[in-house]
Amino acid sequence: DVLIPRQDTELLVEQAITYIKSVKGNVDVLDMCTGSGCIAISIDRLCENAKVTAVDFSQKALVVAKENNALNKADVTFFQSDLFENVEKQYDVIVSNPPYIKTEEIESLMDEVRIHEPMMALDGDCDGLKFYKKIAKEGRQHLRSNGIIFFEIGYDQKQEVIDLIVKEEKYINTYSKKDLYDNDRIVITKVG
């Protein structure tokens, strides 16, 4: 019912944790499209100053995330939301590993992914950017001043994701970071 966490996501978690630990005082974190909850749980366990909330559209994913939360003795708050639909408050950090594979590319994925992973966790629509567009558009109203977004991206999506963020004219200091294999893997942007 959830995407199996992979090594690609480690950079996203590391960068978010490094930032959160650098902030003096408490940090409210929203994990958008939480899936198994691994990102939210890692941040909660490793950042004493973080208060973590995690949302997902899938009730089945939330059941798994809550089980993982209990198994890891974490204190993440989970609730169902179609992106920001049920999100009412503002956060200091939004972290997201949304579905980002183009619909037409799903059939060409490795069997271990295509057959065993839930389609909902993979399919980013025809251009793979559906969730980035929505989060960039609506995210600003759910971020406090100096808020920051951390996105995991597909290896070939850097420029498209940066362009759509810049187009919103709500963010500054938008940049990417490469993973251990020299692929662009995350995009980071701050409230302007």
What function would you assign to each model-found segment?
Residues 2-14, 130:
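Conserved SAM-binding loop and adjacent beta-strand
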Residues 5, 35-36, 180-183:
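Short glycine/threonine-rich catalytic loop with a Thr-x-Gly-x-Asp
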Residues 11-108:
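Conserved SAM/SAH cofactor-binding pocket of Class I
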Residues 16, 43, 113, 135-139:
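Class I S-adenosylmethionine-dependent transferase superfamily signal
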Residues 100, 190-192:
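C-terminal beta-strand of the catalytic ATP-binding
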Residues 100-130:
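Mobile active-site "lid"/loop adjacent to the S-adenosyl-L-methionine
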Residues 126-190:
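Conserved Class I SAM-dependent methyltransferase catalytic core
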